[in-house]
């Protein structure tokens, strides 16, 4: 195996290795019997951090290796540019679009809920005001 193909394999294996390390660390933390709730909270936060880092490593590695030129360069191969670049870019854009949609949906739902609450809240005080400025005779 050449240095170039070693680099490709090393980068490709990073998410799996990171996942394994994260799982082992999380399993070890879960076996600890710690009475302090603040320490347990910090350890849970650390476990969540490990999960997020694994997900980021997976996405970053996938985004890197999906590019034909990068993958070919890491393997030490030559690549005919053209259709492969276009196809890879389309796949990358689809992936980014899917990720953005997943991020936008919860925010869109929250905006709709807040908007509905504001309309209801605005209607109630106006109805309660009655006639302002009229002196009872």
From Swiss-Prot:
It is found in: Host mitochondrion. Gene3D superfamilies: ESAT-6-like. GO terms for biological process: symbiont-mediated suppression of host innate immune response. The keyword RNA-binding applies. Residues 1-79 are annotated as: RNA-binding. Keywords: Host mitochondrion, Host-virus interaction, Inhibition of host innate immune response by virus, RNA-binding, Suppressor of RNA silencing, Viral immunoevasion. One of its GO terms (molecular function) is RNA binding. Encoded on a subgenomic RNA (RNA3) synthesized during replication and which is co-terminal with RNA1. Binds double-strand RNA (dsRNA) with high affinity. Suppresses the host RNA silencing-based antiviral response. Homodimer. Interacts with RNA-directed RNA polymerase. The dsRNA-binding region is required for suppression of RNA silencing. The N-terminus is involved in homodimerization. The alpha2 helices of the dimer bind parallel to the stem of the dsRNA helix. Belongs to the nodaviridae B2 protein family. This is Protein B2. It comes from Nodamura virus (strain Mag115) (NoV). The lineage of its organism: Viruses, Riboviria, Orthornavirae, Kitrinoviricota, Magsaviricetes.
């Amino acid at each position: 195996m050449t240095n170039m193909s070693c680099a490709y394999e090393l980068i490709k294996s990073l998410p799996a290795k990171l996942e394994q390390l994260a799982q082992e660390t999380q399993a070890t933390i879960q076996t600890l019997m710690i009475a302090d709730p603040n320490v347990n909270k910090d350890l849970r936060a650390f476990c969540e951090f490990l999960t997020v880092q694994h997900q980021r490593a997976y996405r970053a590695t996938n985004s890197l290796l999906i590019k034909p030129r990068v993958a070919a360069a890491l393997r030490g191969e030559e690549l005919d540019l053209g259709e492969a670049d276009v196809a890879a870019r389309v796949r990358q854009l689809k992936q980014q679009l899917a990720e953005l949609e997943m991020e936008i949906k919860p925010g869109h739902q929250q905006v709709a809920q807040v908007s509905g609450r504001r309309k209801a809240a605005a209607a109630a005080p106006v109805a309660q005001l009655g006639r302002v400025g009229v002196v009872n005779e």
